[in-house]
Amino acid sequence: SAYRFSYHEQGSPDKEPTSGHTLIMGRPGSGKSVLSAFLMTQARRAGARVFVFDYRSGMEMAVRANGGRYASLNAGQPTGLNPLWTETDARGTAWLSDWLATLLYRADKPLTPAQTNRIQEVVRQNAQASNPALRNWRDFASLFVSTDDGGDLHQRLLEWTEDGRYGWIFGQSLEDTFSLKGDVVGFDLTGILDSEADKERMAVLSYLFRRVEREIEDRRP
């Protein structure tokens, strides 16, 4: 007989979908990836859209076998990500302001209220730019030069421009070219997850989760 499996708690058709509550645990080599691949393939029978955050390419074959797209993100190599390009509507600017405040945080020198307000102002300027080509990290950083903080915010932003130490993450492309199009999308994050730099991991993962969140919120097929 058929076994009716669901990843979610029971919901209602006239309400928001319930969150997923399925967790697979096991020791190395016990078949977690195989089971995940099987469940993913079965979910596709019902038309589910799948995003795979992969480690050591454990799901690559399953993603490709399901006709999906698969890409790798590696530390030190351009990612094609650029939140300045994508987060330009009302929801996006609110998220981007909070995210940048976290990204630029330093335990030894927390942001002042004036700096936080300045971030919000510049994010709005970025969203309203008449020329989309200005939505790059170097031009974005230049908007902080006039901030009355001794150049502190400007210097912090320069680390994320194309020539900065974190420039490989967001500073190498204008348009956000990291595509989530398709019913099955997988990306290998081994190089990011194995990175010893917490800030790099946080930057990449938090923005990737945001991109997926927007896809779900907007009900993009």
Give the predicted meaning of each segment.
Residues 2-75:
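Glycine-rich phosphate-binding loop of nucleotide-binding enzymes
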